[in-house]
Amino acid sequence: MASLKKSLFLVLFLGLVSLSICEEEKRENEDEEEQEDDEQSEMKRGLWSNIKTAGKEAAKAALKAAGKAALGAVTDAVGEQ
């Protein structure tokens, strides 16, 4: 009976040790995944910022060109009269 108790305690102890090791590895993996997600989010934010800035610059250039064309057309129309 005593040897059965010792065996049972040994099995339970080894089970708890392996469980704690697995939980620790799981936490480490979750931390690594979280860091990767943070890095990807930062990259996306940076990329989106660059796209947004380029879009603004393109819109400004297009509006400036359209304004010059309209001004030229008005000037030509006034000059013809």
UniProtKB/Swiss-Prot annotation:
Residues cleaved off as propeptide: 23-44, 80-81
Disordered: region residues: 24-48
Modified residues (Valine amide): 78
Tissue expression profile of the protein: Expressed by the skin glands.
Biased composition (Acidic residues): 30-40
Keywords: Amidation, Amphibian defense peptide, Antibiotic, Antimicrobial, Cleavage on pair of basic residues, Secreted, Signal
Signal peptide: 1-22
Domain of life where this protein originates: Eukaryota
Subcellular location: Secreted
Family membership noted in the UniProt record: Belongs to the frog skin active peptide (FSAP) family. Dermaseptin subfamily.
Record function comment: Has antimicrobial activity.
Full protein name: Dermaseptin-B7
Gene of this entry: DRG1
